[in-house]
Design a protein with these regions (language model features):
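Non-catalytic helical/linker scaffolds that mediate oligomerization, partner binding
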Residues: 1-471
Length: 471
């Protein structure tokens, strides 16, 4: 398949995808990596979808990434004797550890770590932020609150505590079981929910090891304030705007998104923008103008990938949603200002040979009429560095490592082809010319920039650059 866009598409699978033919259509429409959402479905469902993806990957000879998204802790109130209550502004409400069904005056909060972390003056958000409570007093096993924003509260609605860091692991017992299953299955990426601090990444990394790559979901205010440390410890970042938009003021989300994208690009870490990008396409064959603009802005800001959630998992128009997202991406990338916007936000290179090579590639490709940049890389690290530079031409990543190729399905502008292990620079050059032409990325007379690392087989050793013409 010949790449026709640089920003990647991550699509969530669910009941809307009924078989291998649906998967193939989504890939041909522009999907590069699929998300298995472990908040829904069972292991049998996920195993079936995993196999469909791998079958399509083999049929199309096109590396596809698979990301498992762990559910993470779910903080909820308990139940009410009547199933629900109507809370009035200004009234008092106690939240406690007593499992007895609640009423107008109190309700169970089965999370002692929340009670321990809250102080008078802090706020709690209930039911995705629809209700807001302010803590007036804390006791050993309860907190007293005043209702600031009232409304109906029913059984087991969610709780958010944006002003506190909880003494809580991001991995529940369910997550650990799911993670073990996913790693055994062979997923390429693991998305970690409920990240509050860098230590959460270290905890997950200890369990994952080198079996998959780790994507941290930024959805907590404490993660935003420690973003750089978290990103340095992760392989990629997801801007999870759903919970993030509950825990911070909605008007802050666009600037936070922009800052996250800039930080990730400076660190050379792929960044995915997610949540409600084409939400109306769950039930409509066409998006709203605001949704189109949302996707376009993420592309313009330099995101590596954009994600579809319910649109492809359970919506009525999964294929149309992918097709629309691809159209928006291509329209933006072909616009007159896209490259200039990326150039303005280009990060400063580090004083390393590999970074110097990546910068040289970008400069040369802006001077010469280069058709494609070709990296031969066993780990994929040199192609990630090249992607950070956001060159004006596509990046062809040649690798003998299928896992590396799947990892790069989330990286901006990188198109991977798995080939035999090469041992000489001349062999790399001849193979690059052959594959670039076969992939439809170059034709006779085109100029190619080709990089490799000598000695071969050492990750991160890129130190050679050649300019070749396809004859």
């Amino acid at each position: 398949m010949t790449p026709d866009k640089k920003v990647k598409i991550l699509a969530t699978l669910g009941p809307a995808t009924r078989g291998i033919d649906d998967i193939r259509e989504l890939v041909q429409a522009g999907v590069n990596i699929f998300r298995l959402n472990f908040s829904h479905g069972d292991h049998t469902d996920h195993a079936q979808r995993y196999q469909w993806i791998r079958d399509v990957e083999q049929q199309l000879n096109y590396p596809l990434g698979i990301l498992m998204d762990l559910q993470g802790p779910k903080l909820r109130v308990g139940q009410f004797a009547d199933g629900k209550v109507l809370l009035q502004r200004g009234q008092a409400l106690r939240l406690d550890l007593d499992p007895t069904p609640g009423d107008q005056r109190r309700v169970n909060l089965p999370h002692p770590e929340i009670i321990a972390a809250l102080e008078p003056g802090m706020d709690l958000l209930l039911d995705d932020g629809k209700l807001r409570l302010r803590v007036t007093a804390r006791h050993r096993d309860a907190i007293d609150t005043e209702v600031l924003n009232g409304g109906e509260l029913s059984d087991r609605k969610g709780v958010n505590v944006p002003q506190a860091v909880l003494d809580l692991s991001p991995l529940t017992a369910k997550d650990r079981r799911d993670l073990s299953f996913g790693l055994e299955l062979g997923v390429d990426w693991v998305a970690l929910s409920f990240v509050q601090r860098p230590e959460d990444i270290r905890e997950a990394r200890a369990l994952i090891g080198d079996k998959a790559f780790l994507m941290a979901k930024i959805e907590k205010p404490s993660a935003v304030t420690q973003l750089r440390e978290i990103a340095e410890l992760s392989d990629a970042i997801m801007v999870a705007r759903g919970d993030l938009g509950v825990e911070v003021p909605a008007e802050s989300v666009p600037q936070i998104q922009k800052n996250i994208i800039g930080t990730c690009r400076a660190l050379g870490k792929p960044v995915v923008v997610a949540t409600q990008m084409l939400e109306s396409m769950r039930f409509s064959p066409a998006p709203t103008r605001a949704e189109v603009t949302d996707v376009a802005n993420a592309v313009a800001e330099g995101a590596d990938a954009v994600m579809l959630s319910a649109e492809t998992a359970s919506g009525d128009y999964p294929l149309e949603a992918v097709q629309m997202m691809s159209k928006i991406i291509r329209q933006m990338e072909n616009g007159p200002d896209y490259q200039a916007q990326l150039d303005v936000s280009r990060p400063k290179a580090e004083a390393t040979v590999s970074d110097a090579i990546s910068c040289a590639i970008r400069r040369i490709s802006s001077i010469l009429p280069v058709a494609v940049l070709v990296n031969y890389s066993e780990s994929g690290s040199s192609s990630l560095r090249a992607a950070r530079e956001r060159p004006a031409v596509p990046i062809l990543n040649l690798t003998p490592n299928l896992q590396a190729a799947r990892r790069l399905t989330v990286a901006w502008g990188v198109h991977s082809v798995v080939n035999d292990r090469l041992k000489q620079v001349d062999e790399v050059c001849s193979t690059a010319l052959e594959i670039a032409q076969a992939q439809g990325m170059a034709q006779r007379g085109d100029t190619l920039l080709i990089t490799a690392g000598v000695p071969f087989g050492q990750p991160g050793s890129t130190n050679s650059l050649r300019i070749e013409t396809l004859i």
